[in-house]
């Protein structure tokens, strides 16, 4: 099972047809933004201060694991500032001209959102530096000895960059962000509120215990919680009367092979491989990727963060180690 096929993968191309539903249930204002209290409180102050001064919000870097709401937060910032937002991603901006076209079309105080900003090419980054710092665009015209540089003034704007790999950003780029926000995995109670709100937006009949059951198995990630909710809805409509209680949610999630800890087939495969094939570790990333037939980037960016955060896996200089908690979860003698 490749990562893209996992129901609980934070990003899943197989579910693009439900993007419309995702947009419908996303919060539009900070008041509706559940969890991440420290981020919400800080951004409320920064936004109000910028509005009082009639200035563009300072450039904002948002980082954290996939599915925690970086894009949602960027759109909320634009809504709160009452400005337009233009969205792109690092891999799309292949040439300096691609970025220049976006920047020159911005209006005063607008937001430019660049997802996966760590994947910007060095050439594009060089164009971004003066734009962020001085609101100026340096463009080379002509070639060879006849080449010359011209400066184009830009209106004040806010760059919002999102990344799952803040450490991969170059220091010059990272230092130009005046505001940095890290999104953490969500608490179960916050996820329960998110699931209940999504159910209300979709017009579903859902008990709080049903929302709790979905939240408990969502790996601390709103995107996964909403995806599981939609599958539980399908189960409730086909196998029941459409009403979602704790028992219905439990049966639906068990059918989806998502266990009580939110682990799916790939999570269990990874942990069991370490315990059964490598004696609990340490095991290197290359060997682990070969053992479970998965890409190294997927293991590092998607599988491992939650397992490490929950105490089932450890990264050491010698490799990955399955913890005592992992052995206890599977009932395996160490």
Curated annotation (Swiss-Prot):
GO terms for molecular function: ATP binding; ATP hydrolysis activity; four-way junction DNA binding; four-way junction helicase activity. It is an enzyme of class 3 (hydrolase). GO terms for cellular component: cytoplasm; Holliday junction resolvase complex. ATP binds at residues 25-26, 67, 70-72, 133-135, 176, 186, 223. Homohexamer. Forms an RuvA(8)-RuvB(12)-Holliday junction (HJ) complex. HJ DNA is sandwiched between 2 RuvA tetramers; dsDNA enters through RuvA and exits via RuvB. An RuvB hexamer assembles on each DNA strand where it exits the tetramer. Each RuvB hexamer is contacted by two RuvA subunits (via domain III) on 2 adjacent RuvB subunits; this complex drives branch migration. In the full resolvosome a probable DNA-RuvA(4)-RuvB(12)-RuvC(2) complex forms which resolves the HJ. Residues 260-334 are annotated as: Head domain (RuvB-H). The keyword Secreted does not apply. This is Holliday junction branch migration complex subunit RuvB. It catalyses: ATP + H2O = ADP + phosphate + H(+). The RuvA-RuvB-RuvC complex processes Holliday junction (HJ) DNA during genetic recombination and DNA repair, while the RuvA-RuvB complex plays an important role in the rescue of blocked DNA replication forks via replication fork reversal (RFR). RuvA specifically binds to HJ cruciform DNA, conferring on it an open structure. The RuvB hexamer acts as an ATP-dependent pump, pulling dsDNA into and through the RuvAB complex. RuvB forms 2 homohexamers on either side of HJ DNA bound by 1 or 2 RuvA tetramers; 4 subunits per hexamer contact DNA at a time. One of its GO terms (biological process) is DNA recombination. The gene is ruvB. Belongs to the RuvB family. Has 3 domains, the large (RuvB-L) and small ATPase (RuvB-S) domains and the C-terminal head (RuvB-H) domain. The head domain binds DNA, while the ATPase domains jointly bind ATP, ADP or are empty depending on the state of the subunit in the translocation cycle. During a single DNA translocation step the structure of each domain remains the same, but their relative positions change. DNA binds at residues 315, 320. Keywords: ATP-binding, Cytoplasm, DNA damage, DNA recombination, DNA repair, DNA-binding, Hydrolase, Nucleotide-binding. Transmembrane segments: none annotated. It is found in: Cytoplasm. Its EC number is 3.6.4.-. Mg(2+) binds at residue 71. It comes from Vibrio campbellii (strain ATCC BAA-1116). The keyword tRNA-binding does not apply.
